[in-house]
């Protein structure tokens, strides 16, 4: 039997010495929200997808130390060692390759992941890190071909992620499933790594039936499953697939719309093809929308009837209407916005920021432009190629310097990013509050609807969400960032109790518990950030997968090293933009 070792790059480096690189809630989606900043545990899903779709005895390592990686190399006679990496990890790859050659010389080294865009040709790849094979596309079919295995449908039964308030639990329960619908995007945004990786093509991984079966699996094995993330850079662009999946979800006899929902990505141009109620009936719970900038000319930010022309005011009014319409039905949003685009300058940046705040996204990603040296945008910004680049690989993340701005210094870009996160918290409140408001909108809308699936199934779904999230309201009412937000929380608590009744004894005890824990955390940290928390190491064992029972997890977790806090190596106080006015 073939033996394969899969591994992420060792010891992910904290971003700006402030956040764990794998904690997307802390460093981007709920960043800067004081004690209401969430903490996420995530998984290296691409490697899990590979391990559970080949006929091999496999071990998969998530975020080991170099010592743990070397110990695993020495523990067995591996046939293949597969290492997944991103651009910022490239300096660590040679050390891992050297360890394989030294400790397991018979093994073939396979490298892959989005970091391969930094290795534009075979010679450059060999100079960067020793390897035998490099995957530059969809990994499952690549690996099966390498191992001499026949093709068959891809299964997707990945470990579940989750997010929580870190002062409430040491580790969040896994409640969010994941399903990979496709790689790549046909929009070809100039800064988009995933589109460049697939040369602007869409590489389907799971068809509609595969997505549906993956969603059922997560609910079958875990009654606490809340939603499933469908990964496809613009899933909503493919209306036939969205409608077909929605039909399966609505007609499902076990779970239906009372339980089945998903997060995915959708451009403004894609969303414009739907009536918002269609999306609700199709199971959409949360959508990531790339706003990017008030002044961008990207076609993906325009409605279907705006593709042939560009009127910025009209386009951005459409954007605001889209966010409002989605929120009014209970569909949550993640809005992404980029600082440092060449359409921004010192004169227009306040208007750009104001526009994004007014969209009131449920969650937000506010990033700095990343200029990849191997992509065409690298030539435009004159940053050198992958081997003559001006900036170190460790900078290649959402907040690292990868180009020289023209209208701002790079520190000013970071200041404005921090300031905008802070402003959104002050003016819009914590994302937990925005999410609850949105779910309450969904409940009201569905209860009024004439459509039976909305009035019965989806209203039940939203009621469960509101009841589950409402216990945080006393903490927001007491410790929110300002009187306006605290007042909103009290009013929302009153509305919830009018709809669903006063909390029962057990609920009151839990609300009081949350408030006491929140007060203790606020006394300890105020509005400051928590120390960096190191990424958890986990070792998974997989066997041959073709006959693996569908209703059971296809892996065993055989060893863990829990996350732990570490001292910051350099002081990194939260930046504040001078222009932020706190109401």
Label every model-predicted segment:
Residues 163-334, 339-341, 347, 351-354:
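Radical SAM [4Fe-4S] cluster-binding motif and immediate context
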Residues 13-17, 23, 116-121, 234, ...:
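Flexible glycine/acidic-rich beta-alpha junction loops that bind and position SAM and/or redox cofactors
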Residues 2-21, 70-80, 382, 400-583:
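Radical SAM enzyme core and accessory elements
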Residues 57, 108, 285, 332, ...:
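Residue-level detector of anion-binding/catalytic polar loops
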Residues 1-224:
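Acidic, low-complexity intrinsically disordered segments
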Residues 122-142, 278-287, 351-366:
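Structural recognition of alpha->loop->beta junctions
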């Amino acid at each position: 039997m073939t033996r394969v070792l899969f591994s992420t790059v060792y010891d992910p480096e904290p971003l700006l010495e402030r956040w764990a690189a794998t904690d997307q809630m802390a460093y981007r989606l709920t960043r800067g929200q004081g004690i209401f900043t969430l903490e996420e545990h995530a998984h290296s899903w691409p490697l899990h997808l590979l391990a559970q779709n080949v006929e091999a005895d496999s071990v998969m390592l998530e975020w080991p130390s170099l010592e743990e990686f070397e110990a695993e190399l020495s523990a067995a006679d591996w046939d293949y060692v597969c290492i997944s990496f991103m651009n910022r990890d490239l300096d660590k790859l040679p050390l891992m390759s050297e360890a394989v050659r030294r400790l397991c010389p018979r093994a073939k080294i396979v490298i892959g992941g989005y970091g391969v865009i930094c290795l534009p040709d075979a010679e450059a790849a060999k100079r960067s890190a020793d390897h035998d094979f490099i995957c530059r596309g969809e990994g499952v079919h690549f690996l099966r071909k390498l191992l001499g295995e026949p093709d068959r449908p891809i299964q997707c039964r990945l470990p579940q992620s989750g997010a929580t308030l870190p002062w409430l639990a040491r580790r969040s329960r896994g409640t969010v499933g994941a399903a990979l619908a496709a790689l790549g995007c046909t929009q070809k945004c100039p800064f988009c790594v995933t589109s460049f990786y697939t040369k602007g093509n869409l590489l389907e991984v799971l068809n509609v039936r595969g997505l549906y079966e993956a969603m059922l699996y997560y609910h079958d094995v875990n009654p606490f499953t809340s939603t499933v993330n469908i990964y496809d850079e613009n899933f909503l662009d493919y209306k036939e697939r969205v409608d077909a999946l929605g039909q399966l979800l609505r007609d499902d006899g076990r779970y239906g719309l009372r339980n089945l929902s998903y997060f995915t990505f959708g451009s403004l141009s894609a969303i414009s093809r739907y009536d918002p109620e269609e999306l609700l009936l199709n199971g959409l719970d949360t959508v990531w929308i790339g706003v990017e900038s008030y002044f961008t000319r990207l076609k993906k930010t325009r409605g279907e009837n705006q593709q042939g022309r560009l009127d910025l005011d009209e386009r951005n009014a459409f954007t605001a209407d889209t966010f409002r319409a989605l929120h009014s039905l209970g569909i949550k949003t993640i809005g992404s916005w980029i600082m440092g685009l060449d359409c921004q300058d010192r004169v227009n940046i306040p208007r750009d920021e104001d526009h994004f705040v007014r969209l009131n996204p449920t969650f937000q990603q506010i990033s700095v432009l990343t200029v990849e040296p191997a992509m065409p945008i690298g030539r435009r910004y004159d940053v050198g190629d992958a081997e003559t680049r001006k900036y170190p690989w460790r900078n290649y993340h959402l907040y690292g310097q990868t180009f020289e701005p023209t209208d701002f210094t790079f520190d000013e870009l970071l200041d404005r990013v921090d300031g905008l996160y802070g402003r959104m918290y002050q003016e819009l409140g914590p994302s937990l509050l925005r999410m609850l408001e949105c779910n309450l909108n969904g409940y009201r809308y569905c209860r009024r609807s004439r459509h039976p699936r909305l009035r019965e199934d989806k209203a039940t779904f939203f009621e469960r969400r509101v009841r589950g999230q409402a216990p945080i309201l006393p903490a927001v009412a007491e410790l929110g960032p300002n009187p306006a937000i605290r007042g909103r929380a009290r009013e929302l608590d009153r509305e919830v109790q009018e709809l669903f009744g006063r909390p029962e004894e057990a609920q009151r005890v839990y609300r009081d518990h949350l408030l006491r824990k929140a007060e203790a955390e606020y006394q300890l940290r105020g509005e400051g950030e928590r120390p960096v928390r190191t990424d958890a190491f986990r070792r998974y064992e997989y066997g041959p997968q073709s006959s693996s029972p569908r209703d059971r997890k296809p892996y065993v977790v055989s060893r863990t090293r829990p996350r732990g806090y570490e001292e910051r190596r350099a002081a990194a106080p939260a930046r504040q933009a001078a222009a932020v006015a706190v109401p």
